[in-house]
Amino acid sequence: MSKDREFLWRRLHSLLGVVPVGLFLAFHLSLNFTAVGGEKVYNDATGLMELVPHSLLLLMEWVIIYIPLMFHAFYGVYIALTATHNTKNFSTFRNWMFKLQRFTGIFLVIFVAWHVFQTRVQKALGADVDFNMMVEIVDNPWMLGFYIVGILSATFHLANGLWSFLVSWGITQSPKSQQITTYISMFVFVVLSIMGVAAILAFV
């Protein structure tokens, strides 16, 4: 792959990780967070999506979610497998964040694929994607743990990826601005993690 082409692919990968994939994750966690209000609140909130015509909803899912997500995931695996880690020689915070970003990315490919199978695929087969479905999914302690790790991996990957996005796109160039966005990304991670974990525990 030529350097110019790889540069463009990496920029596209970075952009799609924030828009629309990152925005969708924040929306998805916010929607699931309604589960803390109980079964009716959750079902009413998620049921609003059913008001969108099926063909339009399907088109939106593929264009806004699935296609960008698959590109970001598969190209991300390529980056993870070909990237050079400096953690053996340098114990800096950013080098460890770099390594964790790649590790969580690979894990999320497995987690997201399984989550889609348990929800969207089952819906296509006639199952109802509602509060009770999630209760049944996390009824197994191992599956609950798997989902918690998946949620934390996703929120970290987004928060740290947001920092990388701002740097790679030249938005934060000075050490001070990068330090500030480090704190912002930590805040994003904590807030989204609390929402995500609280949501999944609401089904227990």
Residue ranges of model-derived segments:
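Membrane-embedded alpha-helical bundles that constitute the cytochrome b-like, heme-associated redox core
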Residues: 1-204
